[in-house]
Swiss-Prot record:
Pathway: Cofactor biosynthesis; pyrroloquinoline quinone biosynthesis. One of its GO terms (biological process) is pyrroloquinoline quinone biosynthetic process. Disulfide bonds: none annotated. It holds the Pfam family PqqA. Coiled coil: none annotated. Keywords: PQQ biosynthesis. This is Coenzyme PQQ synthesis protein A. Required for coenzyme pyrroloquinoline quinone (PQQ) biosynthesis. PQQ is probably formed by cross-linking a specific glutamate to a specific tyrosine residue and excising these residues from the peptide. Belongs to the PqqA family. The gene is pqqA. There is a cross-link at E16-Y20 (Pyrroloquinoline quinone (Glu-Tyr)).
Length: 24
């Protein structure tokens, strides 16, 4: 990904994606 924000943003997105797939 090409995020210019701090690393915690990428970590949060990864968490969001994980929860998204987990709730499918």
């Amino acid at each position: 990904m090409a995020w210019t924000k701090p690393a915690y943003t990428d970590l949060r997105i990864g968490f969001e994606v994980t929860m998204y797939f987990a709730s499918r």
